């Protein structure tokens, strides 16, 4: 399998490109996504896929998440870049109630494909309302899957898994890792399975579990 050294955000972007080419029901929306997004993961998407599938929105995170819930029921596969994890609190009803629970509340015989991208943590100058680690919120709501990639390879592989997942996924990219670089597989079928641990060092005396 061939590899290329690239940045964490670029690896996320590669996954988006590959999956949008493969599946025309995927579209992305958020503030500034048509011009590359907050951290560059969406760079070039509007040029290739057009503004019908790469949609700039105003500053209303609740609207973005609500649109994703409705589009999911209609059979589309929305991706929402919320800009920062802090904004999970603004869109909480749509994410933690509607996206997470509608299938089960209403007996819907449909998948709820949706990926919500939350950049979390901080880097210089982000400010107190753009620096929270909100991934723990999603862990307490049945119906959601939560991922937090720690390197460029996982950023690509987990994004591809999230885009193929029939349940809503909260994809937490780490701001401080945004421009870190690593070897990324170029195989368009490379996926990191959600929910399967990577064993970094096998042993029998002690287990350390982290993310």
Spell out what each predicted region is.
Residues 206-211:
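Glycine-rich phosphate/diphosphate-binding loop of Rossmann-like nucleotide-binding domains
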Residues 179-197:
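Glycine/aspartate-rich loop-and-adjacent alpha/beta segment that forms the canonical ThDP
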Residues 135-136, 196-198:
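Short, flexible, solvent-exposed loop/turn segments with mixed acidic/basic and small polar residues
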Residues 92, 195-196, 202-203:
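Glycine- and Gly-Pro-enriched alpha-helical subdomains that act as flexible
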Residues 1-177, 187-189:
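Thiamine diphosphate
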